[in-house]
Amino acid sequence: MKVRASVKKLCRNCKIIRRDGVVRVICSTEPRHKQRQG
């Protein structure tokens, strides 16, 4: 899980979602692409 000021999709399978007011990126194919805005 990377914590970044600006989260971006890193591949075509990344999805940007908003959970409890926090923007996150989840990725099914590459778990290293997981990010959280912070």
Swiss-Prot record:
Pfam families the record matches: Ribosomal_L36 (PF00444)
InterPro entries for the chain: Ribosomal_bL36, Ribosomal_bL36_sp
Taxonomic classification: Bacteria, Pseudomonadati, Pseudomonadota, Gammaproteobacteria, Pseudomonadales
GO CC terms, sorted: cytoplasm; ribonucleoprotein complex; ribosome
Source organism of this protein record: Azotobacter vinelandii (strain DJ / ATCC BAA-1303)
UniProt cross-references to NCBIfam families, sorted A to Z: rpmJ_bact (TIGR01022)
Name of this protein: Large ribosomal subunit protein bL36
Alphabetized HAMAP family for the sequence: Ribosomal_bL36
Ribosomal protein listed as a keyword: yes
Family stated for the protein in its record: Belongs to the bacterial ribosomal protein bL36 family.
GO biological process, one term: translation
Entry keyword annotation includes RNA-binding: no
Single GO molecular function: structural constituent of ribosome
Keywords: Ribonucleoprotein, Ribosomal protein
Source species, domain of life: Bacteria
